[in-house]
Each structure stands twice: as C-alpha cells, then as structure tokens.
Amino acid sequence: NYQWKKSMKWGEFDLNWGRPLKSILSIFDKKVINFRFHHLSSSNSTYIDKDFEEKKKFFKDFKSYEKYFKKQGILVDQEKRKKLIEREFLRILSKKRLSIKDNSKLFDEVVNLVDNPNILLCSFNKKFLSIPKEILTLTMQSHQKYFPIFNNKDEITNEFLIVANKKDQKGLIKI
C-alpha cells in the first residue's frame, strides 16, 4: 500500500495515486510477470499518448521498450538523463567561467521532470540584480526550477540555466 504525498482518486476505482494508472507493463527476461494491482493486470503492453491519441503498444523486452522511446526522443534511463544534464551544464558554464551552487535536491527533481532534457542558458534584465541574491536564488530554484549562475566572486549574475523537456523544434522559445 503505497502512500503518495499528494494523490488523487482516478475514475471510479478505489485507488489513490499520483497520476492516472491505465496499464502496468511488467516484463523480465522476455516474459510477462503476471500480477494484479487494484483494477489492473500486468502485461507486455502500455498506452502511448502521442499527439493526444492514445495507442496501445506491445514490447517483448526492456531493450525494445528503451529503443522505442529513444526513437521518440525520450531517455528512459534516469542516469543517462542525469549525465546529459551534467555534461551540458559543464559545457555551458566552463565556456563562460561561471558556476552554479550545488543543489542536489533540485537537480534530482529536474532530472525526473523531463524525458528529453534540453539545457538553455537564459538571462533577465540586470536591473533585477538589485534584489538580494537570496531572494533571487530562492525564487529561481523553488518556484521556477531554474539554476542561478554565479561568477568567481560568488556574486549572482543575471543568467541562469533551465532544463526544458525536449528541443524547441518550432522556435517558440525566445531567450
């Protein structure tokens, strides 16, 4: 019996969960691990929500699952997402000789908020640097899930890093 910090009742089923459960994909060594959880039975299928059209997809093993989602631009492996974000942070920050503060809680949260991380370097008007850095930092980290950037004197800059979910293919993000 798992208890979520915040959960909701979905549909007419007697189950509280963080998100709606539609299926349980459970395969190991190319075999379905059969079990029931409330109103659901495990199988080798799941529902894919693509362009607001729900489709049932079957998988023979984890490799086929991971391959399918990779083609969709989704990194299933949390460690791969984490390493990609770290690598991009380092690349951007080392070019500018700047840094971010260690905030593993925020970093772990962001790793789990995205499927296909896209790191963006953003900035705000320098006039807002008159606001105490503690307030700027708290606001960016707690409310916006951004990573404020600091110079080598430990002063906050008007730049910050964000981790977006997927690349902006249509050019809608203006930085």
What are these language model-derived features?
Residues 1-145, 150-154, 166-167:
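Long, basic N-terminal domains or extensions that often function
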